[in-house]
Amino acid sequence: MTYEEAVNYIEGIGKFASDTSLAHTDRLLDKLGHPENGKKIIHVAGTNGKGSVCAYLRTMLMEGGYRVGFFTSPHLVRINERFQIGTEEVDDDTFLWAFEKVKEAIDEFLREGGTHPTYFETLFLMAALIFQKAETDYIILEVGLGGRLDATNVIRHPLACIITSISLDHTEYLGDTTEKIAGEKAGIIKKGVPVIFDGNDRAAAAVIRRRAEEMGCPWYELTRDCCIPVSTTTGGIAFDFTWKDEKNGGSAETYRLQIPQIAEYQMANASLAFLTMLILREDHGISAERLAGGISKMVWPCRMETVLRGVVVDGAHNPDGIAQFIKTADQFHRNYKITVLFAAVSDKDHEDMIREIVEGIHPERVITTRIEGSRCISEKALAEEFVRAGQKEVCSEPDVGRAFDLACSERGDGMLFCVGSLYLAGQIKSHLEKK
């Protein structure tokens, strides 16, 4: 089998198969010899910010000289991006090796009467093998969807469980309130394992606290007042992170952190990751100064990323993410005329996102496009929604590459923001790589 054949096989698997049992995943891992056992794993769930938190964790551990495996989703351009050793995606040969091992286990499982694993399960099984072969010191696991029933939740003894900000997303799977969604995310909490979480949604935070206490876990809640901006430039944000472990009577400690991103929401993500590493100090032995150095080196594509002069790509894909995007866009670019390139998938609340964009940054013009895949919304339907929201100048172009080139030419001396979907971000990155 070739690499291309392996990718085609995986892409042909239904992403949301009917069997979501963790026992199902566990039986397949058993056939692979449970490569995940005995590994030092940090497990990360949440609605927004999961990938960024994972990326901060990675650079801090790398700053300490550790070999780090990182399983993430979705990919932007190539499926290999989901499996990273350090900051490098795995090569095609390693990808194919892992797939063939997993395919052998799947075939045996099917002969025994089992059902085929989902798209995400298959990738997770491959990740477990890849990180075992790479002899990683730590593994950072990003939940795919939810938490309680996610394939990654088969792990038994993580070092820490992190839950990032909670908002409404994937409501058809996770529930229609932040409390219900938090309940699904809190499903990753394991007995006695430290829980570090974003507490800015009070209702969601109460659910997470309750679950942590039920499981006998020490828990650490971060709120906005933990992060105080000191200075902001086009090169990033310096801020003071202050933490006081009130439950254990600790005194307040303040750390000056520098993130290389211009988005204010990254302060919370960096703080969650930094606090987690402080809590795990006895395990990794990295000083606070070196951890701060790791924070300053974090790179994570398509999160308020400037890809060309005056052109920013952001992966915000739900109303809460769009609200954070608008806050940053308005702060840095209020003196520029703004062009927006927008696309979305059908299971996202695109009406609210569109309304927030029109009311929040008042674009001079909007160009809508259509991303690849069965879940796409047509560019014409999106354009009509922008008109209903009060946007005056709107045009549509179905091809993402042509839409991007058109938007770049239309922006003039202003700013272009490309937003609405990580899939849009990935297709733009792919388009730029071909130029």
Cite the ranges covered by each PLM segment:
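Extended acidic/charged loop-beta regions that coordinate divalent cations
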Residues: L123-Y173, A205, R209-T254
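Beta-strand->loop->alpha-helix junctions that form or flank phosphate-binding loops
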Residues: D198-G199, R211-T233, I259-E264, L291-K297, ...
